[in-house]
Amino acid sequence: GIAVVANSTWRAMKCLEVLNPKFEGGNTKGLTSKKIKEVLTSKLDDLGKVEVVADKVLDVEYEVPYLHHATMEPMNCTAYVKDDSCEIWVPTQFQSKTLETAMDVTGFSEDQIKIHTTLLGGAFGRRLETDFVTQALIVSKSLKKPVQVVWTREEDTKHGFYRPLSISRFQVGLNNEGKPLQWESQVSQPNLLAQFVPSMGWLNFDPMTIPAAVHDYPLIPKHFYEIDGV
């Protein structure tokens, strides 16, 4: 990677424009939204549909695309890695993960690291990740000076962690009064839990896929969910 260090954010941004670095891409090169959708649709087809017998049957499909969090305030982190300690100022939603990240990058123990949680602004879950913390730590460790990393809106949009693409199918049986008697649904989307908490990778579905699925619906006699995580 490339880091441009200057005495102002503007100077750093202009210097990076002059460098105009080009990156070939990693192991996801060639991956497109179309290919991802094809995989999810295939998984959904594997689940199949449940036959619903009722006076009226609604059979619908919904799809939401990958969505950027678009934090209202720039992604930023200030880090100062010294010879025997580290101090971090960061708007984070996950202090323990930030601590683990700092320990991994610096090699320091927990008692050698101090984290100041600043005001978050509009985080929307994006600041649960620590990639921007890693950047500040690596540069500060190299320079042995305090460094503030600030992402431009363009960088934030290109390199964010996106809310997942999801495809859902519903079959709802209604009586002659229009009240639901049977609710069947199939959902296919990436398993965020396995990504965010690798130790939970053994779980072949993400309960967060359908939060309402954990609740009972006393007004609907029959309801059934099928989830396929990718």
Predicted regions and their residues:
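Structural alpha/beta core scaffold segments of enzyme domains
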Residues: G1-V230
